[in-house]
Amino acid sequence: MFSFYFNDNKITKLLMVGYGSTGKSVCDFLANFIDITVDISQNDDEFVNYDLNSYDLITVSPGIPLNKSPYRALTKFKDKIVSDIDIFYQYIKDTKAKTIAVTGSNGKSTVVTMTDFVLKDLGYKSILVGNIGTPALNKIGEKFDYCVVEVSSFQINLFNCVRFDLGCIINVSPDHLDRYQNFEQYKQSKLNLAKFSNDFFVYDVHNGIKYAGEYQIIRGAIYRNSTKLLDIVETKLFGEHNLENIIVVLNILDRLGLDINQAIASIKKFKGLEHRCKIVKKVNGTTYINDSKGTNVGATIAALNSITNSKNIILLLGGVAKGGDFSLMIKSLDKYVKYVYIYGADKEYIESYIKGYCKYQLCNNMKQAFELASQKANSNEIVLLSPACASFDEFSGYAQRGEVFQNLVAQLEQKS
C-alpha cells in the first residue's frame, strides 16, 4: 500500500463532509492508502465539532449547502476544498484517456448518456460518471478511452484543480434559486466550468449566449452548413428539443476528432432516457407522457414547446419548487395547455405565479392530480407529467415519481 498524495503533497488527514454516494466513494477509495486519517461529518451537529484548520484536505459532497450555516465556515478554507472529481483526475491525468464534462439546467443527462452510448457503439471504451448517478471514483480501476462526466453547478463550485479535455454548457435556465442569490450567480457558476477545461463551448440558443457552431435546426432536421444530416423522425427520440441535444453531442464528437457520419448512425439507435418526454401509453385516445425528469421550469417549458402544436395538454405540475420562476412558463401554458393540476409541497407558491393565466385546480398529491386529469382528458389530448419541481416531498426521486405515473397509466388501461 502507498501513501495518498494530492498535487504532489502527502495527505495525512482529510475531512469528508457529507456521506452520500459521493462521500462513500471517496472514503472507499482512500481506504486503499496508508498513513491517512479520514474523518466523516454526516450532519450539522457533527460538522461543528471538527477543527477545519487541522486538515490537509476537505472533501465536500455536492449536496452540502455552502451558503447556509454551519457550512458557510468552509468558504474560509477554499484552498483546502477538493471534489471527488479532483481526486479522480489526479489519478487518471497521466493516462491517454480523454475527459468530457457537460453541465446545464436541462438536457445534460441526455447529452452525456447519448455521448457515452455513441462512443461505445463506435467501439471505444467509455465510462459515464458524475451527477448522472455513478461517482467517478467508483470507476477508478477501469480502463477507458473516454470519461464522460455530468457535472452540476454545485460540483463546479467545489472544483480545485481538475482539467477536462473538453467542457460544454447547454440550456441554462433558472434553477436551484434556493442555493443561489439570483439567476446571474447560478449562470456564472455554470460558466466557471471554462476555468477547468482545455477546450470549451456553449450551446444555449434560447438565452442569447453565442453559439458559433456549424449545425442548425431547420424544419425538424439538423443541417451542417447546407447539408441535411438527420431528421428527428429517423431517431427513436421524441420532441424537437432532442435535436438540440444531438447538436451538442455532434459538437463534442467533432472536437474529439471522430467521424460524424458514423456517429449519426449510432445516434439513430439511441433510445433516450427513462422519464424524459417518454410516451407511456395511449388510453381511450389520450396520450400519457412521462417527463418526470423535468425538475425545473426550463425543462417543462422545453417539453411543452416540443410535443404538440395544439392547445391540447393537461399538465401535472408540482413538488418542491426550489425558488423557480413559474411566470416564465406562462407563454407556453397559454399556447399549449388546456388545464393544469397543481400538487405538492409548493402548490400555493406555483399558484401565485400562474393564477389568472390558465385554468387550474389544486390537488392533494400526484395521484389525485392524475385521476382528475384522466377524467378530464378527451381523445387526441395529452396528459403530461412534467412537474417543473423536485420530487422529494412525496417521492425518493424523479425516477420513483415517473414509475408511479407509469403504474397509474397501467392501472387506468386495465380498467378501460
Swiss-Prot record:
Keyword field contains Metal-binding: no
GO cellular component terms, A-Z: cytoplasm
Broad class of where this protein is predominantly found: cytoplasm
Any one GO molecular function term: ATP binding
Keywords: ATP-binding, Cell cycle, Cell division, Cell shape, Cell wall biogenesis/degradation, Cytoplasm, Ligase, Nucleotide-binding, Peptidoglycan synthesis
Protein's UniProt keywords contain ATP-binding: yes
E.C. no: 6.3.2.9
Cellular localisation: Cytoplasm
EC class (word): ligase
Signal peptide: none
InterPro entries: Mur-like_cat_sf, Mur_ligase_C, Mur_ligase_C_dom_sf, Mur_ligase_cen, MurD
Listed GO biological process terms: cell division; cell wall organization; peptidoglycan biosynthetic process; regulation of cell shape
Domain of life assignment: Bacteria
List of residues binding ATP: 104-110
Alphabetical list of Pfam families matching this protein: Mur_ligase_C, Mur_ligase_M
Pathway, per record: Cell wall biogenesis; peptidoglycan biosynthesis
Catalytic reaction equation(s): UDP-N-acetyl-alpha-D-muramoyl-L-alanine + D-glutamate + ATP = UDP-N-acetyl-alpha-D-muramoyl-L-alanyl-D-glutamate + ADP + phosphate + H(+)
Task performed by this protein: Cell wall formation. Catalyzes the addition of glutamate to the nucleotide precursor UDP-N-acetylmuramoyl-L-alanine (UMA).
PANTHER family according to UniProt: UDP-N-ACETYLMURAMOYLALANINE--D-GLUTAMATE LIGASE
The family this protein is said to belong to: Belongs to the MurCDEF family.
Protein name: UDP-N-acetylmuramoylalanine--D-glutamate ligase
Organism: Francisella tularensis subsp. tularensis (strain WY96-3418)
